[in-house]
Amino acid sequence: MANIERRVIAEGEEFCVECAVRTDLTSPVSEFLDGIEGGAADHVGDLEPDEQIRWYDWFMAACDGLAEYGTLPHRHDHNQLLDGIWEIKHSVLRITFFDTDGSGEYEPLIDSDSYSRFTTRPWPDDFLYYLRLTTAFTKTAPKAPPAEIELAKTVRTEDLEHDRSP
């Protein structure tokens, strides 16, 4: 497998936010963003087209700030889910991501056990430069659906494989 080009959402002093790519060269987040940009996504609950477009605009601006300054607009705009999978959240929509150095290696910065002991939401200052967006979903329950977390981990595994190949 050869290195591939990823859709870059934002690149700045702190991070490069880009879409992860699966083994079959699809990108779930890229496809999701294309849908909500035009208000045409069909798996976003009851969000009307204009709400989808507003969410897209918020997300793109949030990624610009994240890439340049290393932070999201508000401290409640993210969560760590499990095993190094994080989410950017706004309203009911979620986009999962992980960090990497771009070499195909991966090690979670904070595990779920240590995360549960924090009294505030941690934002690791030592995230690696590449933040790869993996999946998108609508959150309708108090916790992220386990199947969504597993899918994000699968996309991460497949995406990192591209980095390991010459």
Q: Which residue ranges define each predicted feature?
A:
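Basic, Lys/Arg-enriched alpha-helical interface segments
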Residues: 1-92, 101-131, 137-166
